[in-house]
Amino acid sequence: MTNELINGVALADTPEKLVKAVQELALAKDVAAIPTLIAVFGYNNPTAAAIASTALVQLGEVAVPQLLTQIDDYNYGARAYSIRTLAAIADPRALDVLIDAAATDFAPSVRRAAAKGLGNLHWHKLEFPDNQTAPKKALETLLFISQDAEWSIRYAAIVGLQGLVNIPDLQQPIHTRLKEMLASDAEKAVRARILLAQSQ
């Protein structure tokens, strides 16, 4: 059954047929569909990609290894969907990929998705001492990109920092950085997002 649905995605020859085929494949909730759902990210069909991403998030942790290995280095749109999906699943195995994407990817959409994801990972799933060191690595990256020239990256860094602020060891450096940014950032939207983070 799933093979037929996978073939349906491969054979879809219009954007509308692709969306319908991906919807049907998503409903199967079958791990065998994971590679095809990830491949849909590269088909230049935002509706189909969004459906595929939602399906992968619903499958959860079982999708993470293939999401990590199938990241598209050449198509930044596909890469952004992969990063957003990993961020939504929030499995800490994605930490290094999210750090790399947030700090170095050339596509702002990829960097923003990764930055937000870094504040949202399920750290409790890590064993000691990784559950101590991993959030600090995320913090270092977010502090670094909070100085980026692009305001939307700084904004995403604040979202990520807000996600980490519940970790006691990280509260002081986060509060300090947000105060610095509130006093110095020229972008009104960034300052507004800082105030929101501080009010939570």
Swiss-Prot record:
One of its GO terms (molecular function) is lyase activity. Its EC number is 4.-.-.-. The keyword Lyase applies. SUPFAM superfamilies: ARM repeat (SSF48371). One of its GO terms (cellular component) is phycobilisome. It is an enzyme of class 4 (lyase). It holds the Pfam family HEAT_2. Keywords: Antenna complex, Lyase, Phycobilisome. The keyword Lyase applies. Gene3D superfamilies: Leucine-rich Repeat Variant. InterPro entries: ARM-like, ARM-type_fold. Coiled coil: none annotated. Belongs to the CpcE/RpcE/PecE family. Required for the chromophorylation of the CpcA gene product. CpcE and CpcF associate to form a lyase. This is Phycocyanobilin lyase subunit beta. The lineage of its organism: Bacteria, Bacillati, Cyanobacteriota, Cyanophyceae, Nostocales.
